[in-house]
Amino acid sequence: MKKYDIVIISGGFDPVHKGHVRMFKGAKTLGHKVICGANSDKWLVNKKGKAFMSFAERSEILEAFEYIDEVMAFKDDSEGSAINLLTQVQQLYPNCTIAFANGGDRTNKNSPEQGYENRIMWYNECG
């Protein structure tokens, strides 16, 4: 039985690799709807010097995965966190149970989203 109405995941996904796919699958086991926040091209340039694929390309690829129900753009912040995405989803779905599930580059020590306590459960190392 799925625990949450919505599970939020986020990342650059530039390019998508098997670790991302495992995260998508893991997120889908937690909730009925998976919302994937894709970081902006500007965020990718700041993180790694360039964007391999544009936001539009990454979004189209992400939307094709059966585990992802919706892809959202969100405003990047100075920490590279998905806090603005969490706020955006919570405003769009105020009556839903929501979890944020991430993996990859994030750990308990470098995840600013972990401090976001506005009714959203937090999972690290999803998938």
What are these regions (language model features)?
Residues 1-127:
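Nucleotidyltransferase catalytic core that binds NTPs
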